[in-house]
Amino acid sequence: MTDTYNSISNFIENELTALLSSDDYLMDDLAGELPNEVCRLLKAQVIEKRKDAMSRGKQDLLSKEIYDNESELRASQSQQIMELVGDIPKYSLGSELRNRVEGEPQSTSIERLIEDVLKLPQMEVADEEEVEVENDLKVLSEYSNLRKDLILKCQALQIGESKLSDILSQTNSINSLTTSIKEASEDDDISEYFATYNGKLVVALEEMKLLLEEAVKTFGNSPEKREKIKKILSELKK
């Protein structure tokens, strides 16, 4: 931060030099009312007093006070960023989010995280003529890119979360079907069931068709029942 302090000190010194070199306004109100020699002596004393009030030591104190205030402001802004982001270490953020998906206790809210990221302050370089402006612009660029990247990733997590309930529902249906098949076949290996499923289904439908054809002959005296059975048969043949 030496460059920042030197910039402040040089600015104060230049401003004071310009002020002291422009003394035309001194004693203007008394011009013509006092002898010229008296005005000259008074002007010299005023300049001397002003120089003493703005001595190098006092300039240094003023520069240090301004520098400390700026450092305090930067520290305050950094603290604000830390408070808004939260106290989650960056290396554990992924674990926190995974725990939430897996149903474990979690302390991270995606919505809260996005809200905090959006609250990160917009920061700008106060004086583009400072010596450190190039480095400051680089830091601000990295900060802005990080903020944008965080927002995009959080939004991607939101989209994924919205699809999670559908995926879990489908998974539960598959698990329920698998359990039912295992109970019916009394075999933990269900690959055989799926391999022979189509063949067994065709056989079952053929048997049903034969039974229905027999039923048509049985209900010969009931045109209404016979028509219903024929309709079922026509559907099976499609």
UniProtKB/Swiss-Prot annotation:
Keyword tRNA processing in annotation: no
GO biological process terms held by the UniProt record: attachment of spindle microtubules to kinetochore; cell division; meiotic cell cycle
Subcellular location: Nucleus; Chromosome, Centromere, Kinetochore
Modified residues (Phosphoserine): 222
A GO cellular-component term linked to this record: nucleus
Keywords: Cell cycle, Cell division, Centromere, Chromosome, Kinetochore, Meiosis, Mitosis, Nucleus, Phosphoprotein
Superkingdom, natural source: Eukaryota
Quaternary structure and interacting proteins, as annotated: Component of the inner kinetochore constitutive centromere-associated network (CCAN) (also known as central kinetochore CTF19 complex in yeast), which is composed of at least AME1, CHL4, CNN1, CTF3, CTF19, IML3, MCM16, MCM21, MCM22, MHF1, MHF2, MIF2, NKP1, NKP2, OKP1 and WIP1. NKP1 interacts directly with OKP1 and AME1.
Family per record: Belongs to the NKP1 family.
Function: Component of the kinetochore, a multiprotein complex that assembles on centromeric DNA and attaches chromosomes to spindle microtubules, mediating chromosome segregation and sister chromatid segregation during meiosis and mitosis. Component of the inner kinetochore constitutive centromere-associated network (CCAN), which serves as a structural platform for outer kinetochore assembly.
Name recorded for this polypeptide: Inner kinetochore subunit NKP1
Gene it is expressed from: NKP1
